[in-house]
């Protein structure tokens, strides 16, 4: 369910704003989106897994807060990230 190290490193390379960037909002949102997509698929198969459901809701809330921060501080980066990830905000 969690993103593998290899996949996480691929995401970091793809969304990093500079060399060694692992903490920018874009990277964090991209990794959370991958996690959310994996958990969503898990929940489709295991609908009674309430512990994973709570974790999914927490990750969605964290991503929402990061996106809100980016929207308030840099609208162009926000719009570019939403387009790259294909989110419906």
From Swiss-Prot:
One of its GO terms (cellular component) is cytosolic small ribosomal subunit. Disulfide bonds: none annotated. It holds the Pfam family Ribosomal_S15. Gene3D superfamilies: 6.10.250.3130, S15/NS1, RNA-binding. Coiled coil: none annotated. One of its GO terms (biological process) is translation. SMART domains: Ribosomal_S15 (SM01387). SUPFAM superfamilies: S15/NS1 RNA-binding domain (SSF47060). Belongs to the universal ribosomal protein uS15 family. One of the primary rRNA binding proteins, it binds directly to 16S rRNA where it helps nucleate assembly of the platform of the 30S subunit by binding and bridging several RNA helices of the 16S rRNA. Forms an intersubunit bridge (bridge B4) with the 23S rRNA of the 50S subunit in the ribosome. This is Small ribosomal subunit protein uS15. It comes from Lactobacillus delbrueckii subsp. bulgaricus (strain ATCC 11842 / DSM 20081 / BCRC 10696 / JCM 1002 / NBRC 13953 / NCIMB 11778 / NCTC 12712 / WDCM 00102 / Lb 14). The gene is rpsO.
């Amino acid at each position: 369910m969690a993103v593998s190290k290899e996949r996480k490193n691929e995401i970091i390379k793809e969304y990093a704003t500079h060399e060694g960037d692992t903490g920018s909002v874009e990277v964090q949102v991209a990794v959370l989106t991958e996690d959310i997509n994996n958990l969503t698929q898990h929940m489709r198969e295991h609908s009674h897994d309430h512990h994973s459901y709570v974790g999914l809701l927490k990750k969605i809330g964290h991503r929402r807060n990061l996106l809100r921060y980016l929207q308030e501080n840099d609208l162009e980066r926000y719009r570019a990230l939403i387009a790259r990830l294909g989110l419906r905000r």
